[in-house]
Amino acid sequence: MIDQSKLIERWKTTFETAQNPTELLAFKNSFRNADLKPLLSQIKETTDIETKRHLGQLYKQLESTLQTLHDTQLQVFTQAQSSSVLTHGDVMLLATSFAPGSSNIIYQVIDELVNYFKKFLFTVNYDSELTTIADCFDLLNIPKDHPSRNLTDTFYLDKNRLLRTHCTAATLRAVKETKKSNNPDIRIASFGAVFRKDDDDATHSHQFNQLDFMWIKKDFSLTNLKWFMQNMINHIFGENTSARFRLSHFPFTEPSFEIDIRCWLCQNGCGVCKKTRWIEVLGAGILHPQVMANMGFSDTDNIRGIAAGIGIERLVMLKHGISDIRDLYDNNFKFLAQFTD
């Protein structure tokens, strides 16, 4: 059992020994890893509802206290620095030191995904954000009356070119190019920015990041898809993460699935999972025969493809408990400093 008062006193005493803001931030990150992460793991593993609720409240209290202690001591440094500059300093002098940088949490998750796909010998593809109607819609079996083709949903440059609405367009081009070498086992993953005419709010953005993959091989089946996706979910969210596959519909896969993970904050439903006990993560499926034919594969060869599209920001928000997607883009250093790698 955590002795809350002793833990907070240890944090406070240690923060007061910091010599500068960089060391102060290092202390805070150390405390998060050593004291709070084990508690979060305990919450995920606990099955008793009351225990989970109690530990969740304790985690929120400790996290808030840690941030408050850090901010209080940081204010001491800020005031001392301002006083020193105003009294003695030459404000025109160049800075003698800079705070160390760190990769953004979006790219931390992209790196995790890229490392996962590289373990399975995928070619990782980063292509142009500009694409054609054929690659973005026609060759992916998206009908001409589909809402995503509308001018109100997509950024068109002219009658044939547009900003891609998904990374599948890049993956499709790479697969067609790779097929020219008669490779019997094609593994392509693409990532990058995609664009949609959405109004920016807590869960939507007109520009966000996506990772898409296709793995095409003889005799592939749903078993291969479920095995591969479950392993990827475990890689991102931790071993033994429960996942379920719900039948859905996408024009480019048949059958199609929405993949959900078990909500780690509750047992009987909460605000995060909208009382369903499950949280939607991504879409996947077996590539539609028409899409396979459009890429030059013959149905008689019994070649099948598995595919999925993954919203990076959604994974980041789920992984770190972030409720507003705009927080990822606002360049709030205080917010971003919590997730230094």
UniProtKB/Swiss-Prot annotation:
Identification of the protein by name: Phenylalanine--tRNA ligase alpha subunit
NCBIfam families assigned to the protein according to its UniProt record, in alphabetical order: pheS (TIGR00468)
Assembly and interaction partners: Tetramer of two alpha and two beta subunits.
InterPro entries membership: aa-tRNA-synth_II, aa-tRNA-synth_II/BPL/LPL, Phe-tRNA-synth_IIc_asu, Phe_tRNA_ligase_alpha1_bac, Phenylalanyl-tRNA_Synthase
GO molecular function, one term: tRNA binding
Residues the record lists as binding Mg(2+): E254
Keyword Aminoacyl-tRNA synthetase: yes
Alphabetical GO biological process terms: phenylalanyl-tRNA aminoacylation
Keyword vocabulary terms for this entry: Aminoacyl-tRNA synthetase, ATP-binding, Cytoplasm, Ligase, Magnesium, Metal-binding, Nucleotide-binding, Protein biosynthesis
GO cellular component term of the entry, any: cytoplasm
Compartment(s) of residence: Cytoplasm
Pfam family of the protein (one): tRNA-synt_2d
Enzyme Commission number, as recorded: 6.1.1.20
Organism of provenance: Mycoplasma pneumoniae (strain ATCC 29342 / M129 / Subtype 1)
Cofactor: Mg(2+)
Class of the enzyme per the UniProt entry, highest EC level: ligase
CDD domains hit by this protein: PheRS_alpha_core
Protein family membership: Belongs to the class-II aminoacyl-tRNA synthetase family. Phe-tRNA synthetase alpha subunit type 1 subfamily.
Co-factor remark: Binds 2 magnesium ions per tetramer.
Catalyses which reaction(s): tRNA(Phe) + L-phenylalanine + ATP = L-phenylalanyl-tRNA(Phe) + AMP + diphosphate + H(+)
